[in-house]
Each structure stands twice: as C-alpha cells, then as structure tokens.
Amino acid sequence: MSEYIKFSCERVAGEITSFGGLAELNAYRRKLLDLRLIGADPTGVGFGNLSVRDGATKNFYITGSATGGIQELTLTHCAKVVAWDFERNRVRYEGSVMPSSESLTHAAIYQSDATAGAVVHCHCSRLWAAILNEAPTTSNAVEYGTPEMAYEMTQLFTRTNVQIRKIVVMAGHEGGILTFGKDLEEAFAILMRQREKISPE
C-alpha cells in the first residue's frame, strides 16, 4: 500500500533490532482496534497509526504503512524515523517496512512540542464532525501526508491552543483525528475524553 505514501523514503538501515515500547504500543493498538478507531476498511486498506518518541531524541518509532488491520505488531511492522525534511518532502527511516503515510505529520508534532512523547492518529467520523472547528483544526484544503499538512500542523502550535488541548481535527481528511501527549497513556486518554462527549454508537 505504499501508493498512499506521498513523500520520498530513504531506508538507511535494515530491520529494527529493538524497540522497548513495542508491548505498550500493541496494548493501546488493541484498545483502538476494539473501538474500531484504527483498522482496515472492507477493501483491506488500513487506517490509523501510532508513534512513540525514541527517548530524548528527535527520532520516533511509528507503525508501518498498511499495518492498520494487523492485530499484533512485531518489529517488522514498525519503522524508526531518524530524519525528515518538510521542504524536500523526504523521510529517512530504519526498518523493514515503510513508515506510515502520516510520518511527516507526526514529525511536525514532535518538532513543535518537545514534551510530546506519543501520537495517535485515528478515524471516527462522528467525533470528527462533532469537534470540527471547535478543536484545533487544519485547513480543509490541505491533504493528509503532505508537506503542507506538516507545515499546517506547525502553524497550529503558533495560532491555536493545541499545545494545551493536544488534539487536532484534520478537516481535509474526513474522520481523521490526532491526539498526542507525554506518552501513549495520555494521548489515548485525551481521545477517550473527547469520545465520551458524543452519544454511544
């Protein structure tokens, strides 16, 4: 499913040999899968992704492209993003799978907020519609996975209270919502608090 990736990728190393946060990432992925906030559509196209910052570095681990529907991830399903260039629309990574198509968007959050340690990108049409333009929202003219989205994300940190609310609605990517926090626990909790505001499906 690499056709959904809109940036150029440079693989700089083979398989990831270790990722201490994999068990926790899988635990929160299972919760999101159970809630159908990530997964795969009827045609098998995956949606949703998670990432975790690599300690105090700028690098981050992210679920690989087209892995949304996989129940349990291994190291072969994750990539480690080690460099990016918004202007050149380029990502450098380690791993045996290409990083998620939203890697530049995740990178923009980590670059803009030094306290961010994890990012969740999910899909929920009802929540998306409920908080569109009420929560920090990207322009509906900006497509997902593009340098424009990365720049838009960085701008949200200067013109909105996104650093406090830690949630973003992607207006040009129907259903797309991002939350972030110091870790996956916080990013997931923020999403759940917002979800509780809408009536049960």
Q: How would you label these PLM feature ranges?
A:
Residues M1-E201:
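Glycine-rich flexible loops
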